[in-house]
Amino acid sequence: MADGSGWQPPRPCESYRAEWKLCRSARHFVHHYYVHGERPACEQWQRDLASCRDWEERRSAEAQQSLCESERARVRAARKHILVWAPRQSPPPDWHLPLPQEKDE
């Protein structure tokens, strides 16, 4: 990976620019603030865009390493969320019975 001969960035540079632009939009700001209670952090997208452009222009090893680490961190962050509900292997035994509110009527 250090030689960079056949390596390509994980995403096209346009993708990093689009993500950065979306992150800075008013709509995303309002949504993120409503959901998380804090401002969205867009600096990483900007750093990734700069690294991608640096890679395209100079084939910089530092830019390559930065992009790889950033994408790995994104994958780890996406995988760390656990399921809220445990998946069922089979339906409950009484699934066909009427619901309690239907019994009262």
Swiss-Prot record:
Q: Please state where this protein is localized.
A: Synapse; Synaptic cleft
GO biological process per UniProt: negative regulation of long-term synaptic potentiation; regulation of synaptic plasticity
Write one Pfam family the protein is assigned to.
PANTS-like
Q: Name where it mostly resides.
A: other
Q: Which UniProt keywords apply?
A: Secreted, Synapse
- Gene Ontology cellular component terms for the protein in this record: synapse; synaptic cleft
Q: Which InterPro entries match?
A: Pants/Emi1-like
Q: How is it modified after translation?
A: Rapidly degraded by proteolysis following neuronal stimulation, resulting in increased AMPA receptor clustering.
Q: Which family does it belong to?
A: Belongs to the UPF0545 family.
Q: What does this protein do?
A: Negatively regulates long-term potentiation and modulates adult synaptic plasticity. Stabilizes the interaction of RTN4 isoform A/Nogo-A with its receptors, inhibiting clustering of postsynaptic AMPA receptors at synaptic sites. Upon neuronal stimulation, degraded at synapses, reducing RTN4 signaling and allowing AMPA receptor clustering at individual synapses.
Relate the assembly described in the record: Interacts with RTN4 isoform A/Nogo-A; the interaction results in enhanced RTN4-mediated inhibition of AMPA receptor clustering. Also interacts with NCAM1, RANBP2 and CCT8.
Protein name per UniProt: Synaptic plasticity regulator PANTS
